[in-house]
Swiss-Prot record:
Belongs to the ATPase delta chain family. F(1)F(0) ATP synthase produces ATP from ADP in the presence of a proton or sodium gradient. F-type ATPases consist of two structural domains, F(1) containing the extramembraneous catalytic core and F(0) containing the membrane proton channel, linked together by a central stalk and a peripheral stalk. During catalysis, ATP synthesis in the catalytic domain of F(1) is coupled via a rotary mechanism of the central stalk subunits to proton translocation. One of its GO terms (cellular component) is plasma membrane-derived thylakoid membrane. This is ATP synthase subunit delta. PANTHER family: ATP SYNTHASE DELTA CHAIN.
């Protein structure tokens, strides 16, 4: 990942500088999330855009027809530059790095939350408040995923901190305690 990160950082940093000047950083961050979601869920899209067989012009034409109405000109220009330079295989890393740089520049903490079932709005608000106090910032972004294997409860990852309030985690800890006792 360090090599991919060193490739992604200049592109992501340039995009952040441009979007800051144009005051569209938040909009582009949301578009990056949407694009990442589409990229991760569409294997045919990934295969086509990373194929060494397709010419850069064909990739740019496809990207323009697919995304020109959904993304800002700044993000569209980045996609075209990546296509021209045969860097579309690094698109995911570039978008993720942009989001990291965006959060860092605005002091936004990212918490990855796995819950056994979807959280109610009230639970999400309480969780957001707790994560804000843990992070020491009022700006938090919560990446919430449902994971039924937790049986009940949730797990929060905030940087290097982990809070495991899941039933499966409690069962695992109980098993470890019993193994130590015997």
């Amino acid at each position: 990942m360090p090599l991919l990160n060193s490739l992604a950082t200049p592109y992501a940093d340039a995009l952040l500088q441009v979007t800051d000047v144009r005051q569209e950083s938040e909009e582009v961050a949301n578009q990056c999330k949407d694009l990442l979601s589409a990229w991760e869920s569409s294997e045919p899209l990934r295969d086509a855009m990373t194929s060494p067989v397709l010419e850069p012009e064909a990739k740019k034409k496809a990207l323009t027809s697919l995304l020109s109405e959904q993304v800002t000109p700044s993000l569209m220009n980045l996609l075209k530059v990546l296509a021209d330079r045969q860097r579309l295989p690094a698109l995911e890393a570039v978008l993720l790095r942009y989001l990291e740089l965006y959060r860092e520049s605005r002091n936004i903490a990212l918490a990855h939350v796995r819950a056994a079932q979807p959280l109610t709005e009230e639970q999400q608000a309480a969780l957001t408040t707790k994560v804000q106090s843990m992070a020491g910032t009022n700006a938090v972004e919560i990446d919430l995923k449902v994971d039924p294997s937790l049986i009940g409860g949730f797990v929060v990852n905030l940087g290097s901190q982990v809070i495991d309030a899941s039933l499966s985690g409690q069962v695992r800890r109980l098993g470890l305690a019993l193994a130590k006792a015997s």
